[in-house]
Amino acid sequence: MTTKAEGEKLLYCSFCGKSQHEVRKLIAGPSVFICDECVDLCNDIIREEVQEADGLKPKSGKLPTPKEICAILDQYVIGQTQAKKNLAVAVYNHYKRLEQGGQKDDVEIAKSNILVIGPTGSGKTLLAQTLARLLDVPFVMADATTLTEAGYVGEDVENIMQKLLQKCDYDVEKAQRGIVYIDEIDKISRKSDNPSITRDVSGEGVQQALLKLIEGTVASVPPQGGRKHPNQEFVQLDTTNILFICGGAFDGLEKIIRRRSEKGGIGFGAEVKSKEDARAIGEVLRDVEPEDLIKFGLIPEFVGRLPAIATLESLDEDALVTILVEPKNALTKQYIKLFKMEGVDLEFREAALRMIAKKALERKTGARGLRSIMEHALLEIMYDLPSIPNLRKVVVDEGVIKGDSPPILIYADEPRLETAS
């Protein structure tokens, strides 16, 4: 017969410390116990990690189709229909490939990284950022002009992976399914398409260093942004499933394409083309071939790692005006909201929008230059705005953008129009 002391010996959960009377079930193992509450907690943690590893799909849980991706891109980026289609298909196929990655099959689908070619301010970066936001995946940008080969002064290519890890709070699983956008990729072209015996640490050397990273390798990244040194444990990051999007303006590439197409026209059946090809640069860039990129200065192996090519066209005046008013985060909407915070309405007349677009075209800055033009034009009224009593509305016309006249001010207690002094 057991004594009372032995019969009342309490057992405790080895994880949370609760007694057997405080929980519904206590599961025994070799010298350890776990309660039903801790089992539920462990299940929740594992389920969350599995969902995150799977979590390339947007928050709805379903990967959007190329048409749905294009429709969302249309809300933020004006025009560039063909480029959007190219990007939507490439991104959809990439993440579809990752969805099926766990299935055993004899056919392995290779990764298709993307090259985006287009003039400054045409929307290359915005497209990549919008895609990452839509798919709810980590996104990081890198500038190719700051990269050098490992061992030289400057950033080495593994710094890109370090930025990606930092973006995910060093969650390796999450980082391994992110998007990396490398801008100014055309600036690391070698000086000629002939191999050189001299060292080119910021051109061909960087292309060579990026090769393995883009194709898929296990990169050793210093923990928590530290510098590499011996006897240090590195974070191992597999880049196989990271989508790389490389973008650049590729100034002069259209001349290489035109020269190639002129050489191709030989014989009676050939299409006759004038020396001065009247086609727009964007239209010419659509005909780009890998050989043109190699002539430009990208090494053949690097071109081969970027099979999906999307070309963007220069934005004309109409497109720039549309960019000012239509997208969800259009500049005019941003300034209207800013003025509304002061209790004042802001109106842009059509002529003012046209003048902003013309100035951006003159500066050859594309959509990127629109904000600086508006900021300069509205500086004086934004300076005075909090100090003007009873102001109801500000009207911006062409003269304000030109700098010839102040904006029209409409006061709450006066129906007539006045101008800022």
Swiss-Prot record:
GO terms for molecular function: ATP binding; ATP hydrolysis activity; ATP-dependent protein folding chaperone; protein dimerization activity; unfolded protein binding; zinc ion binding. Belongs to the ClpX chaperone family. It comes from Methylobacillus flagellatus (strain ATCC 51484 / DSM 6875 / VKM B-1610 / KT). GO terms for cellular component: HslUV protease complex. This is ATP-dependent Clp protease ATP-binding subunit ClpX. CDD domains: RecA-like_ClpX (cd19497). Component of the ClpX-ClpP complex. Forms a hexameric ring that, in the presence of ATP, binds to fourteen ClpP subunits assembled into a disk-like structure with a central cavity, resembling the structure of eukaryotic proteasomes. Residues 1-54 form the ClpX-type ZB domain. ATP-dependent specificity component of the Clp protease. It directs the protease to specific substrates. Can perform chaperone functions in the absence of ClpP. Keywords: ATP-binding, Chaperone, Metal-binding, Nucleotide-binding, Zinc. GO terms for biological process: cell division; proteolysis involved in protein catabolic process.
